[in-house]
Amino acid sequence: MALKYLLDTSVIKRLSRPAVRRAVEPLAEAGAVARTQITDLEVGYSARNETEWQRLMVALSAFDLIESTASHHRRALGIQRLLAARSQRGRKIPDLLIAAAGEEHGLVVLHYDADFDLIAAVTGQPCQWIVPAGTID
């Protein structure tokens, strides 16, 4: 299967939850999911030491990597402007970059973060909750 989905950090950080794992595993096994470089940075930020950081990076390598580009940054700025026009400022910069990468590559952003509903409302891009909102936190 070709790439179809882009994982947000909100999904990756919840892979220990059975419902999230059940949703992601078949997609990962089919080679249908990717992650972005900003996601690697977000996940690596939580590492308490080098050993844990290395373990996290190895785990992330199970997903294809979408490299950050200048066009992602330009689009993230554009999305930020569209949100500001609606007085919906304050969306996290990593979310804007992930959304921009997903949009450019024609991928559905899989998330567990309401910010993506706001982003999708201005971009029209496909975003999907990995499990229904409010069911695991």
Curated annotation (Swiss-Prot):
Q: Cite the InterPro entries for this sequence.
A: PIN-like_dom_sf (IPR029060), PIN_dom (IPR002716), Type_II_TA_system_RNase (IPR050556), VapC_family (IPR022907)
Q: Which cofactor does it need?
A: Mg(2+)
Residues bound to Mg(2+): D8, D95
Q: What is its EC number?
A: 3.1.-.-
Q: Which UniProt keywords apply?
A: Hydrolase, Magnesium, Metal-binding, Nuclease, Toxin-antitoxin system
Kindly give the SUPFAM superfamilies that the UniProt entry links to this protein.
Answer: PIN domain-like
* Residue ranges constituting the PINc domain according to the UniProt record: 5-120
- GO molecular function term, any single one: RNA endonuclease activity
List the residue ranges forming a coiled coil, or say none.
none
Q: In UniProt terms, what function does this protein have?
A: Toxic component of a type II toxin-antitoxin (TA) system. An RNase. Its cognate antitoxin is VapB51.
Which family, according to UniProt? Belongs to the PINc/VapC protein family.
Q: HAMAP family per the record?
A: VapC_Nob1
Q: What is this protein called?
A: Ribonuclease VapC51
Lineage from the top down?
A: Bacteria, Bacillati, Actinomycetota, Actinomycetes, Mycobacteriales
